[in-house]
Amino acid sequence: MAAVPNTETCTILVNDVELVVPKGELIVESVKRLGLEIPIFCYHPRMKPVGMCRMCLVEVGTKQPDGSVRKMPKPQAACTLPASEGLVIYTDTEMVHRDRRGVLEFLLINHPLDCPICDRGGECPLQNNTLFYGPSTSRYLEIKRHLPKAYPLSQYVTLDLERCIQCGRCVRFTEEISGDHQLAFRFRGASMQPSTFKLTDFESKFSGNVIEICPVGALTSAKYRFRARPWDLETKPAQCTNCSVQCSIWFDYRSGRFVRVNGRTNEFVNEEWTCDKGKFGHDWYNSEKRLTTPL
């Protein structure tokens, strides 16, 4: 929900660089105007900010009349902080790096070492953020938690609870985007996990999108599972032909054979989402019975 409807602007300072942005714009979006990226897990620009993962912490202060900066005692979540006149932001300080390392260390305490077999490996935000911001070694020596793995939420979506970092993206998608409210969190605290009501099937026409927005490989495609690694794929832009909407999509191929569909951004048609018919209804693409020459 990064868009700001009004045209009123304000001046903020980001890493000592003055920047004019729409008033109320979230800081996580404002810094992109300077080519900066703040690491995120729970934030998604098309959904309301919740500040659940705390990965986007930045130092914040306000400019004083004498030119000095009065800093807040604790870092703030950039995904929930709106821009206002005189706001001062620091994204690259020792405190920020220390806090990001701490957040990642807590997330990795119980995260399984599944990277070599995880379908998200190679295109995983958790991998990338750990490489750039995380600790190089683990101090955790105890036995990790064990939760159900490869749990079928539906015939299309597989859930691995050990990998879940409780970012809430999947739950919020069903509430705010698809509107079917199929997923919710059950239990509380460290035991919190996404689930369907009374453990019924995840019945949604748009369930495949939660696979794409999951930042850690907790939700994976049952059809794509263990079929390829990202660096083995050839990706081409395409239009879905399963209905007249003609959603913009990405086609992924491996060794000349089709393996996966992902949504492609097109603000005028499908934003970035796909329906399950377009995402999973592609078995016939590789069928040997397809016509390859005119009749």
Tell me the role of every PLM-derived stretch.
Residues 2-11:
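Terminal leader/tail segments of proteins
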Residues 13-17, 254:
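Short strand-turn-strand beta-turns centered on an Asx-Gly dipeptide
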Residues 25-29:
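Short, structural beta-strand-to-alpha-helix junction motif
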Residues 34, 38-39:
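Protein-protein interaction/assembly regions in multi-subunit complexes
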Residues 41-48:
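Serine/threonine-rich, repeat-prone extracellular segments and beta-strand-based repeat modules
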Residues 47, 201-203, 263-269:
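Short linker/helix segments within small regulatory modules
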Residues 54-241, 245-249, 257-258:
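Fe-S ferredoxin-like electron-transfer domains
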Residues 141, 259-295:
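Cofactor-/ligand-binding subdomain signature composed of acidic, glycine-rich
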